[in-house]
Amino acid sequence: MHFLDQAKIFIRSGQGGPGAVSFRREKYVEYGGPDGGDGGKGGDIIFEAVTGLNTLIDFRYAQHFKAQRGHGGAGKNRTGAGGNDLVIKVPVGTQVLDDDRETVLLDLTEAGQREILLRGGDGGRGNASYKTSTNRAPRQHGPGWPGEEMYVWLRLKLLADAGLVGLPNAGKSTFINQITNTKAKVGDYAFTTLRPQLGVVRHRNREFVLADIPGLIEGAADGAGIGDRFLGHIERCRVLIHLIDIHSDVDPVEAMHIVEGELEAYGAGLDEKPRLVALNKIDLVDKELVKAFQDELLEGGADRVFPISGATGKGMDALLDAVLEYLPAATVTERPTGEVEEAEDQKPWSPI
């Protein structure tokens, strides 16, 4: 499935139905007069967060969403039926932003969460409501109030408990393959990972979701590389794992400061999140060098440093034990039975 984390769509709520112009004329029935009913209310635009989806790709092809108009009123003071609401289904973690791409209108973080963004217009008044002591047979009626419309941006921020950051080619794909059920692409070149990856980690009878984003380079916050665009996907993480390649040409302390500088430049509180520094690829160097770099990182500002090997799995248990310290009682995947996603039906996916 192709990954898309931003999409622009047009939405319009339904217009209210027109009021009716009707008069009661029945044989042997006294007191006739106007009996036109009011029009029905237009349909609302509703966003619903659903499980089982982690891309906005469907909104590349369906970009206009309009709720149904309310039905017209009828004689005998019958109110028209309301228009059907339009429910737009989006992945959990989706934000709905105004056309300026900055103002957050909705933030859908829970499965099943429903929010009304645009309300349908009220129905127009029927002629019965215009009757007065001086106007016994009014013929005017309300056409129905118009609905609301606007362009909005959808932005997906994946829900993960822990985030994985580092320079390109730091070994993040190998690392996430080692500890999760994900099979990320691995290559001996920078930017092997071109889009965020999610994997479920199971450790000591716990499980949590780990997000891997494309590598960061110096100046990413100013548009260099590709990693800055995806930093939003780790905004919701409780802890970050900073992977540093001990076998790289870049000094580990310098690598740490580059990534920390980009997190601070991006903002959104990323630089304030707890970070666990993982010194990766220790299977390629001797123990003395590992100890020396570990000490340098601690002196350079790291709170905790974990020597690991993504290829062999060495040191992983200690690192994952530390991650568990920052997790809530129930992570993204640890939910009561009643909240677990229901079995998939056979209907093809549609955003409405």
From Swiss-Prot:
GO terms for cellular component: cytoplasm. Mg(2+) binds at S173, T193. Its EC number is 3.6.5.-. Keywords: Cytoplasm, GTP-binding, Hydrolase, Magnesium, Metal-binding, Nucleotide-binding. GO terms for molecular function: GTP binding; GTPase activity; magnesium ion binding. The keyword Nucleotide-binding applies. Pfam families: GTP1_OBG (PF01018), MMR_HSR1 (PF01926). The keyword Nucleotide-binding applies. Coiled coil: none annotated. Belongs to the TRAFAC class OBG-HflX-like GTPase superfamily. OBG GTPase family. Monomer. This is GTPase Obg. It comes from Novosphingobium aromaticivorans (strain ATCC 700278 / DSM 12444 / CCUG 56034 / CIP 105152 / NBRC 16084 / F199).
